[in-house]
Amino acid sequence: MNPNLNIEQDNASEIVAGVDEAGRGPLAGPVVAAAVVVNQSIMIDDIKDSKVLSKSKRESCYDKITNSYYYSIGIASVQEIDKYNILEATKLACIRAVKNLAIIPTKVLVDGNMNFTDNRFISIVRGDQICYSISSASIVAKVTRDRIMQILHKEYPVYGWNQNCGYGTKLHIDAIKTYGQTIHHRVSFKFKGNINHSAILGNMV
């Protein structure tokens, strides 16, 4: 199923923003949310949930989205993830993304089933698969976070973040066991195996 504008068109009197996040599951790096307000007169081909698009297709769609629509980014840091938990940090990133928009939305469609105190926010399960605005936001969030992890990889190359984007691949987990964790790792995240939690690394080359 390709995402469509049915929900947006059902709310034609509203300024509708779609919101999605990237990076809830990784062992390292921030969680990133994007908010997108689409211009319904400009439809971009290939807009789908970012997870089903190739990297090159995501990059191409990202350029078109950011050149055609209002969009913004919200980030919750590793420190906030460890302090509040990943769910609350994700909600924080989503709220920040909406606040950072240059236009104020009157309705906010969010992928998933999170609850927000702001009554503008409406959660839609599998929204990234059915809602064009949310799908657009999923692409912007994913590409933005991947680029952040590319930058962090240059600082700590042994973890392979240029390939795994902080997710728990064998290479990444083995590197944590060998070298310990960095300031960019989520110490609140647990997985099988022994980790040296006290080894906070400086720059590695």
UniProtKB/Swiss-Prot annotation:
Q: Does the keyword Methyltransferase apply?
A: no
This protein's UniProt keywords: Cytoplasm, Endonuclease, Hydrolase, Manganese, Metal-binding, Nuclease
A GO term, aspect molecular function: manganese ion binding
Its UniProt entry gives the catalysed reaction(s) as: Endonucleolytic cleavage to 5'-phosphomonoester
Instruction: Spell out the GO cellular component terms annotated for this protein, sorted alphabetically and separated by semicolons.
Output: cytoplasm; ribonuclease H2 complex
Where a divalent metal cation binds, per the record, is at D20, E21, D111
What cofactors are annotated for this protein?
A: Mn(2+); Mg(2+)
Q: Which residues cross the membrane?
A: none
Q: Where is the RNase H type-2 domain?
A: 14-201
Q: What is its EC number?
A: 3.1.26.4
What InterPro entries has UniProt attached to this entry?
RNase_HII (IPR022898), RNase_HII/HIII (IPR001352), RNase_HII/HIII_dom (IPR024567), RNaseH-like_sf (IPR012337), RNaseH_sf (IPR036397)
Q: How is the cofactor bound?
A: Manganese or magnesium. Binds 1 divalent metal ion per monomer in the absence of substrate. May bind a second metal ion after substrate binding.
Q: Name one GO biological process term.
A: DNA replication, removal of RNA primer
Q: Which CDD domains match?
A: RNase_HII_bacteria_HII_like
Q: What is its main location?
A: cytoplasm
Which EC class is the enzyme in?
A: hydrolase
Describe its function: Endonuclease that specifically degrades the RNA of RNA-DNA hybrids.
Entry's family note:
Belongs to the RNase HII family.
Q: What is the name of this protein?
A: Ribonuclease HII
Species per Swiss-Prot/TrEMBL record: Orientia tsutsugamushi (strain Boryong)
- Gene that encodes the chain: rnhB
